[in-house]
Amino acid sequence: MLLGLHHITALAGDAKATLDHASQVLKLRLVKRTVNFDDPGTYHFYFGDRLGSPGSLVTFFPGFKREAKRGAGQIVSGLDLSQVMLCENDPEPTARLLGILGFTPAGIEGNRHRFELPDGAARVDILHEPQTERGKMGSGAVHHLAFRVADEAEQLEWRARLIEAGVHVSPVKDRLYFHSIYFREPGGVLFEIATDGPGFLIDEPEEALGSSLCLPPWLEPARESIEARLHHDHRIQLLELRS
């Protein structure tokens, strides 16, 4: 069973402005400064509660100059993790996938279709907007939504279940702080199922979370070139980020 939401990841513009907004306006703790493991020239900032607990996490890929265009096939609300909202031209295919994931219908209000996990562990709303054009990714858009599972064994069970249902699912990806599988819902939104562990304390103590640029072991040999690229692309001194 899915335990709820694990995290939500958004695209952002200026890296320093993203850090300031999340910490000062959203009042979130920066628990990890790292990079996008699939694109090490892009920062990946994790914000959450004191320990970065699953379900508290909002993460950002900064550096996107083009602004997003709201539209169908996007998550249009959800940075607070309490009410994730998708915009779809046709809600039925997405509703069927949510059913496979264990969500059940929880009511319709106007063009909003609500789905919930048992005991209210997570809620997803689908806005039915049949005439809305497809959205475009860019700064301000949500990149993907991740659901929680307890461990890798349960994650593999979900992967097999989704494949059996005809869903194209990625292999398991090692994200160091958790393991992930990815798939798209019929409208195009990227979903993820992530494990609760190992967590963010594997490479920094609690009091130092988010204080330095952390890289996974397989990227550590390239640290110098990665830091140089980050500085060049984002125009931010690493010392500024540590302040």
Model-based region annotation:
Residues 5-9, 28, 45, 55-58, ...:
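Short, structured motif recognition centered on aromatic/hydrophobic residues
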